[in-house]
């Protein structure tokens, strides 16, 4: 009984978090973008591992707060190594869990008086990464990437570094989105839901040309970067997690993330003298505030310009 209203809790007591998440992945996740779907499956795996055994009725704010703190402090992997998770990773895991409860209460008729995730503190957003590649690191990375047998891996890394596109934007590209005559790529489905057109450098154009003209390309898919056919016969975006991990290890760059290639690309746009508006048009940053982490580059450039004024 909550505020004079009787709530039937039987369904919440019988459905586990694991069962609810698997239903969510079947019914809700497929309605989202492909890149979001992959991320939700990964987050659900962590939630199931740590909270899956509890019923929806039993999972309270205290247990969720313990999960939050444990993930931030670091849980032990299969090799016995403690791996802390970033604030943003934990925030996203909690966001998925929260939406699971919202859907269960509003759409599945699960009798719960409140979403328990709403009663806990979320980790503060982490500071933006500022990882850049040195010339020596880039040389080592390219040596490792070029040694990989599948050329799609090399093309994807090159395009990421030349264009600043996100991984999901690159791996889900269709042939119709690339116009090599005009040297542009049209992105319809982006992280911030705003379509944009990305200009291509000569190096990026060469990578796309090689990808589209390569004899390994099967005729039955319009994906530019494709994997092997699934059980249903369909090809899905190329996955190269292991290749990237191996390349980083070979290059001695274990702390370097694929998304850092985007930061490197945008930083180079700024260093090349592009205006904030031009950089935003290419990268898709929605506001000048989001580009602030790159402004220190402009400040350093201004020092030399100010010196020339006094000359």
Segments from the language model and where they lie:
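N-terminal DNA-binding module of tyrosine recombinases/phage integrases
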Residues: 1-66, 220-221
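Phosphate-coordinating loops and pocket residues in cytosolic domains that bind phosphorylated ligands
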Residues: 22, 58-61, 66, 73, ...
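Basic, Lys/Arg- and aromatic-enriched nucleic-acid-binding interface segment
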Residues: 80-87, 91-96, 106, 110-167, ...
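C-terminal catalytic core of tyrosine-transesterase DNA break-rejoin enzymes
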Residues: 88, 106, 158, 162-169, ...
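C-terminal flanking helix
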Residues: 98-101, 105, 298-302
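Active-site/catalytic core of tyrosine-dependent DNA strand-transfer enzymes
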Residues: 136, 201-254
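C-terminal secondary-structure termini that scaffold catalytic or DNA-interacting sites
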Residues: 143, 182, 213-219, 227-231, ...
């Amino acid at each position: 009984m909550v505020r004079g209203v009787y709530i039937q809790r039987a369904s919440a007591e019988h459905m586990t978090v694991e069962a609810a998440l698997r239903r969510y992945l079947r019914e809700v996740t497929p309605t989202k973008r492909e890149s979001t779907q992959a991320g939700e499956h990964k987050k659900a795996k962590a939630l199931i591992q740590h909270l899956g055994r509890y019923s929806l009725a039993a999972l309270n704010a205290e247990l969720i707060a313990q999960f939050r703190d444990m993930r931030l402090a670091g849980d032990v992997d299969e090799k016995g190594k403690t791996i802390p998770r970033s604030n943003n990773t934990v925030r996203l895991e909690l966001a998925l869990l929260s939406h699971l409860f919202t859907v269960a209460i509003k759409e599945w008729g699960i009798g719960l008086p409140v979403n328990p995730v709403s009663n806990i503190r979320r980790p503060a957003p982490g500071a933006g990464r500022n990882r850049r590649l040195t010339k020596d690191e880039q040389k080592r990375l390219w040596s490792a990437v070029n040694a990989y047998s599948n050329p799609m891996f090399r093309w994807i890394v090159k395009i990421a570094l030349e264009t600043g596109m996100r991984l999901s934007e690159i791996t889900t590209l269709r042939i119709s989105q690339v116009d090599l005559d005009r040297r542009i790529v049209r992105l319809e489905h982006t992280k911030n839901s705003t379509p944009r057109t990305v200009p291509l450098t000569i190096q990026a154009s060469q990578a796309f040309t090689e990808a589209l003209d390569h004899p390994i390309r099967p005729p039955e898919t319009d994906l530019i970067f494709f994997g092997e056919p699934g059980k249903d016969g369909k090809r899905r975006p190329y996955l190269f997690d292991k290749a990237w991990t191996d390349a980083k290890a070979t290059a001695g760059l274990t702390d370097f993330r694929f998304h850092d290639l985007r930061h490197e690309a945008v930083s180079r746009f700024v260093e090349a003298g592009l205006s904030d508006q031009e950089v935003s048009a290419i990268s898709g940053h929605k506001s000048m505030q989001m580009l602030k982490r790159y402004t220190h580059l402009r400040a350093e450039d201004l020092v030399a310009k100010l010196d020339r004024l006094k000359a």
